[in-house]
Amino acid sequence: GLLDVVGNVLHSLGL
């Protein structure tokens, strides 16, 4: 879902 995408982006940014 959208939240899954957001979580993946944050993880990619190292947050």
Curated annotation (Swiss-Prot):
Expressed by the skin parotoid and/or rostral glands. This is Caeridin-4. GO terms for biological process: defense response. Its main location: secreted. Keywords: Amidation, Amphibian defense peptide, Secreted. The keyword Kinase does not apply. Caeridins show neither neuropeptide activity nor antibiotic activity. The modification Leucine amide is found at L15. One of its GO terms (cellular component) is extracellular region. It is found in: Secreted. The lineage of its organism: Eukaryota, Metazoa, Chordata, Craniata, Vertebrata.
